[in-house]
Amino acid sequence: MHLTPVLWDELPAFQNTPLLKRLFHGGLPQALLSATKTPSFYREWMDSFFARDIQRLFAFRDPDKFNALFEFVMKQSGGLLEITRTASALGISRPTVENHLRALETTHAVTLLRPFHGGGQKEIIKTPKVYAFDTGFVSFCRGWDPLRPDDYGVLWEHLVLEFLRAHGHEWKIQYWRDASGREIDFVIPRNRAEVDIIECKWDPKKLDPAAMKVFRSYYPKGKNYLISPLSIPGYSKRVAGLEIYVSNPDGWGQRLESSRSGKK
C-alpha cells in the first residue's frame, strides 16, 4: 500500500482548500474536506491501521506496542530518530522498534531520511530523520489545535517532502547535518559530482544561509533551492555568495522537468 495525501499541486481540485487547512487537517480527502477537524477520525484511523494493514502484512501480535511507536514517531516527525533512545522511552526492545519501523516504512506511513555525508567534517552519518506521511496526524498527535504560526514551518516541510517524493521519485532524498547543528532540510545527489540542496521556509525572508554556505564549502557543485508557499513566479537571488532559486513546489517541479528534458 502507498498512502498518498493530497499534494500541493492538487489543492485546487479539492475546492481550492486553503493551505493552512491542508496543513492542519492533513491530506486524506475525508479529513481535508471536513468542515471541522474531528480528533476521533485520526484516532480511529491509527487504531484500524494496525488491524487493516500491519497485522495482515507483518503478523505483529501486539497492537499496543505498535501503536505506541507509531504515535511516538508522529510526535518526533520532522526530527532525528535515535533507535536506542526510542526503545528506552517506550520500554520496547530495540529489535522490536526496528521491526516496527520497517513495517511503517514499507507501508509508507513514515519516511526515514538518511544523512548525506562524505566530504565534510563532523557530519552526522547514521541517525535518520523521520517524517510521518500526513500533516494532519502530526498536528493531531502533537496536540496542535489550533495551529500557531510557530507550527507552520515544520508542517510545511512535510508538505514539501511529499511533493518531492511524488515528483522526483527517481532521486534519493536525504538530509545533511553537522555536529554544530547546522542542517539542510533536503539533499538530492544528482550524480557523483553534483548535489542539489533544498531549504523549506514558510517565510522566505527568514532564511539563514549559514548551513548552505558550509555545505557548499564541502560540496560546491549543485543547485540551491528555497521552497516557500509563494503565489508569485520563482526567482533567483544571491545570498551570502550563493545563487538560490526561490519558488513554491511547482517552481521546483518545473525546473526538474527542464533538467530531465535537457533544458537549462
Predicted segments, located by residue:
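Interdomain hinge/linker elements that couple catalytic modules in large macromolecular machines
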Residues: H2-A179
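A cross-kingdom feature that marks ATP-driven nucleic-acid transaction machinery
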Residues: R102-A103, A109, R114-K264
